[in-house]
Amino acid sequence: MKISSGTINFSTIPNQVKKLITSIREHTKNGLASKITSVKNTHTSLNEKFKTGKDSPIEFTLPQKIKDFFQPKDKNTLNKTLITVKNIKDTNNTGKKNISEEDASKMTAAFMRKHIANQSRDYNYRVTGAAPLPGGVSVSANNRPTVSEGRTPPVSPSLSLQATSSPSSPADWAKKLTDAVLRQQAGEPLTTADRDFSNADFRNIKFSKILPPNFMKRDGDIIKGFNFSNSKFTYSDISHLHFDECRFTYSTLNDVVCSNTKFSNSDMNEVSLLYSITTQQQPSFINTTLKNTLIPHKANLSDVILNEPDNSSPPSVSGGGNFIRLGDIWLQMPLLWTENAVDGFLNHEHNNGKSILMTINNLPDKYRQEKVRAMEDLVKSFRSGRLTEARIRPVESSLVSVLAHPPYTQSALISEWIRPVQERFFAHQCQTYNDVPLPAPDTYYQQRILPVLLDSFDRNSAAMTTHSGLFNQVILHCMTGVDCTDGIRQKAAALYEQYLAHPAVSPHIHNGLFGNYDGSPDWTTRAADNFLLLSSQDSDTAMMLSTDTLLTMLNPTPDTAWDNFYLLRAGENVSTAQISPVELFRHDFPVFLAAFNQQAVQRRFGELIDIILSTEEHGELNQQFIAATNQKHSTVKLIDDASVSRLNTIFDPLLPEGKLSPAHYQHILSAYHLTDATPQKQAETLFCLSTAFARYSSSAIFGTEHDSPPALRGYAEALMQKAWELSPAIFPSSEQFTDWSDRFHGLHGAFTCTSVVADSMQRHARKYFPSVLSSILPLAWA
């Protein structure tokens, strides 16, 4: 019998192997149907074992020369070697037939095949072509699960053993893995040896180039059941692969690209994953153990298996390192809490939601104790690092978003440290967001920040009234946030009841207007006027408005109504007709001022005023026209003879024969960037300008119920006439156009109230070209 891989032949195998098999044959020839279950390094006497009977296991001492023949680097590996020989029986049930020479040779081959195939590093042979052993003999090595040699591959006429050397390069290892994975993909059962890639070298291998594309697809093919222990993966790319039931113990995984890599039901103990996990497209660890593994601080560990840690010391890494325990994992920490370290390790609000805080917190609740222990170690690190308030300030929000929540608040150590941090965070929020809108609350803000603010207002109830702008926003978002829990809403409602009972607030809610009209809020509808903001200047002044109105005024659109609220003084409703919204917001309710101004600058009506009434020639009149756009009603009237004469002098040159002069028309097109626009677009803009001048001429602004400035009526009608010439299609009908024209001039007995004309034209524009109207009409008139 020859080993088919070159110069090695059977005669080179030490005689001890032959003698061992001969001994087995001799001790079974007398009818013993024995189960020889193992041959291992033991001091048990062979003869003593045989005296126990035919059904008992028999243990043999493995000769030292056989161990020396293999010369593994780890002698303990061979000492643990097992040879299992099952159910060796005679073929005729007489119990007297000896094992044949051929069967003995097969047993010898099995012995050599299993042991040669499983040698470490320098002795990694692959044996192929062996015929099945007699009676289902199976051999196992290195304490690995026994794989039956009884499955029947194609039997060659003569027994041959093929020993192949270990792959000598990463490319060779990659080729071997590709072969095994493709066989597995094809449905071929792989032996333990087939899946054994321990001590492999995959450095610099990009796995997407050696495996079919389906392995990189979501829910694609899986690399299952492989042993990669002690293997090198440095600088390799295993992105988008799924490893299931694989073993990576003691492997080198530093500087590995593993974007979206999935490790499930795997053993990744004693591994370093430093510099391998980035904030984007992280790997996942599902039901995977990471005992004593070094993990970067931004890893996603939400599905790992944690166990109690052993007593091993913190690891040492090149370049230095600091670690804390998270269960039995080693979690990376900075050596020093520098400014960069504070931002990188703690500021998940600026780092795509990743920080050491979130890494710990995202573990499931069954690991509450492990999470609290890790956070306590983190806080101890803060204290020993002597973090100053100035250094903590940029990450206060991130810190309270985690540490001010259960279960960490149940730790006296953590609570004592986070309390002053939360107080400083709350003070900053009051200072910043009482006069400006809070950021649009996403899921994180609703679940992590709003509860902290509620808790802070609960601890400092005076801030509810001194900073009612912020307080009302917090309650608003708690009651409307889709990701807020019922518990958050209940606490918000309870706090608002305390607010309404405050002496500065309660006088404003018993006027038959608030909430459900009896002084209590009605949280069942967003239309109820449940919110009451106190003036920042006058304790007797308040604004009452609904949920929907408050939301839209904090985050306005071009169509937002800026007068859909009650203005209360001493609890009584007062008219806002002659109050400028911008002045009201600037003086009393600054939380709306920035949003109002942002919308106001997008309204371009003032550009036409500057064309007609230049500040150099008509400075006072220009100011009157601009000021009138900031309120719904004006006390200034321009119907006296002097005012009428002055307006006629200004507008007559612009309206020869009652129509826009060509030069003035071109000035309008240029001012509104309409020179190259379509006739319809030009017509829509002129129509909206006409509605604004109709408003100027009405009793609301410069006219009265019985009179109005003729120049303004004529100019409004001329703008409308030009719009009709350009695009009659934008009008409701020719009849409606004629009706509006007659009303401007009082022709054919038409009612001449320009307030009615302005309102009618404005409704039409809002319905058919609202964006044009919103870009022109002053906010106070909208």
Curated annotation (Swiss-Prot):
<keyword id="KW-0832">Ubl conjugation</keyword>
<dbReference type="GO" id="GO:0004842">
    <property type="term" value="F:ubiquitin-protein transferase activity"/>
</dbReference>
<protein>
    <recommendedName>
        <fullName>E3 ubiquitin-protein ligase SopA</fullName>
        <ecNumber>2.3.2.26</ecNumber>
    </recommendedName>
</protein>
<comment type="function">
    <text>Effector proteins function to alter host cell physiology and promote bacterial survival in host tissues. This protein is an E3 ubiquitin ligase that interferes with host's ubiquitination pathway.</text>
</comment>
<dbReference type="InterPro" id="IPR038270">
    <property type="entry name" value="SopA-like_catalytic_sf"/>
</dbReference>
<feature type="region of interest" description="Disordered">
    <location>
        <begin position="133"/>
        <end position="171"/>
    </location>
</feature>
<dbReference type="Pfam" id="PF13981">
    <property type="entry name" value="SopA"/>
</dbReference>
<dbReference type="GO" id="GO:0016567">
    <property type="term" value="P:protein ubiquitination"/>
</dbReference>
<dbReference type="Pfam" id="PF13979">
    <property type="entry name" value="SopA_C"/>
</dbReference>
<keyword id="KW-0808">Transferase</keyword>
<feature type="active site" description="Glycyl thioester intermediate">
    <location>
        <position position="753"/>
    </location>
</feature>
<dbReference type="InterPro" id="IPR025725">
    <property type="entry name" value="SopA-like_cat"/>
</dbReference>
<dbReference type="InterPro" id="IPR025726">
    <property type="entry name" value="SopA-like_central"/>
</dbReference>
<dbReference type="GO" id="GO:0005576">
    <property type="term" value="C:extracellular region"/>
</dbReference>
<keyword id="KW-0843">Virulence</keyword>
<keyword id="KW-0833">Ubl conjugation pathway</keyword>
<comment type="similarity">
    <text>Belongs to the SopA E3 ligase family.</text>
</comment>
<keyword id="KW-0964">Secreted</keyword>
<feature type="compositionally biased region" description="Low complexity">
    <location>
        <begin position="157"/>
        <end position="171"/>
    </location>
</feature>
<dbReference type="GO" id="GO:0043657">
    <property type="term" value="C:host cell"/>
</dbReference>
